[in-house]
Regions:
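Acidic Gly/Asp/Thr-rich repetitive segments characteristic of extracellular carbohydrate-active
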Residues: 42-77, 81
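The right-handed parallel beta-helix/beta-solenoid scaffold, focusing on the short coil/turn
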Residues: 45, 67, 78, 85-87, ...
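Parallel beta-helix/beta-solenoid
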Residues: 64, 84-85, 92, 102, ...
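Right-handed parallel beta-helix/beta-spiral solenoid domain characteristic of secreted/periplasmic
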Residues: 51-54, 68, 86-132, 154-157
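Leucine-rich solenoid repeat scaffolds
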Residues: 284-334
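Extracellular beta-strand/beta-solenoid scaffold signature
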Residues: 100-113, 130-137, 157-172, 185-194, ...
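Extracellular beta-strand solenoid repeats
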Residues: 70, 81, 88-90, 98, ...
């Protein structure tokens, strides 16, 4: 597809008809037929599914660094693993990845190891549903997950035991961006940052009605947990009607505290437990300018074990919270 001898201008519309994804080229007088699609040709190849490749995974396997995989409108039943750096995986219309007949993960961005991460992978404009986990970014850096609808992913074998049922999850991921997604009705929780995920930004997502299967993690909308999960930003999200807490920062017992995380400008409304919770030795985090309303327990209950001196709390809105601020595992700060 690469052609560096372009001398004239071609205007192209990618016409995806009957799942073929054939490009429709309108050529100005005197110009050569050369589809430009939606980006510079020198950026890499464009691989079309299903026109050029029957499955998304076969296109991923053929892609090199800098390539874009454009998936045409349709319903696809497959698990997708992306391990090549700088690959862009994009839905080109109403693209559904359905796991009704499958188990496991819908889309898994997976590096070789924590020290050899996949870099710069993008996943955008997909509906991912009915898997055990929706989109997982693991051993990766500078990934981008945006404009996806991730819903109804549940633990199919042993609810609340195996840890399945998350919508979007970052595991040992760094400097990545999760934005403008809708994450709904996933069995365990909505968005999770775990196990040494650092310097990530989670922003402008809607996270609602997650956690109907959960007991261990209490159906958290956005969970920040695990040793070394530090210096992340959770901002401008709307977290509504989850079965547990809206936002939770908590480290497992016996591990180093979470620190340096920023939780700001979020709206946590009508969650069945606290709107925002800081628990189990999460220290030195900043929680400012959030709006927590109509949650069934206190808007923000720091745990007895937290280092409150290092915890900066201010500018939050707390009203219309139900209950008497008497969670068994937390005290209330107003």
């Amino acid at each position: 597809m690469k052609n560096r001898g372009i001398t004239t201008l071609t205007i192209v519309a990618a016409l995806l008809v009957g799942g073929l994804g054939s490009p429709l080229t309108t050529t100005l007088a005197g110009s050569k037929h050369h589809p430009l699609n939606f980006k510079s040709i020198d950026d890499g190849e464009i691989l079309y599914v299903p026109r050029d490749y029957a499955t998304i995974q076969s296109a991923v396997n053929a892609a090199g660094e800098g390539d874009t995989i454009l998936v045409a409108t349709g319903v696809y039943s497959e698990n997708v693993v992306v391990s090549t750096s700088d690959v862009r995986l994009r839905g080109g219309g109403d693209v559904v990845l359905d796991g009704t007949s499958l188990s496991g993960i819908g889309i898994h961005v997976l590096g070789a190891s924590a020290t050899a991460p996949a870099t710069g992978v993008e996943v955008s404009d997909f509906e991912v549903r009915n898997f055990e986990r929706g989109i997982i970014v693991e051993w990766a850096t500078k990934a981008r997950v945006s404009d996806n609808y991730v819903h109804d992913n549940v633990d199919k074998l042993a609810p609340a035991v195996l840890g399945d049922g998350t919508g979007i999850e970052l595991v040992t991921a760094s400097a990545s961006d999760v934005s403008d997604n809708v994450v709904s009705r996933n069995g365990l929780g909505g968005i999770q940052l775990r196990v040494g995920s650092t310097d990530n930004t989670i922003h402008h997502n809607r996270v609602d009605e997650n956690g109907s299967q959960s007991s261990t993690f209490d159906g958290v909308g956005i969970l920040v947990t695990g040793a070394g999960t530090d210096n992340n930003q959770v901002q401008h999200n709307k977290i509504v009607a989850n079965f547990g807490r809206g936002i939770l920062l908590s480290r497992p017992p016996g591990t180093v505290p979470l620190s340096g995380n920023l939780v700001a400008h979020n709206r946590a409304h009508r969650n069945l437990r606290a709107g925002i919770a800081i628990m189990f030795a999460a220290t030195g985090n900043t929680v400012v300018h959030n709006d927590a309303r109509e949650n069934n327990l206190s808007g923000l209950p720091p745990c007895f074990h937290c280092n409150l001196f290092d915890l900066s709390i201010g500018g939050n809105t707390w009203d219309k919270n139900l209950g008497t601020f008497n969670e068994t595992d937390a005290s209330c700060l107003q």
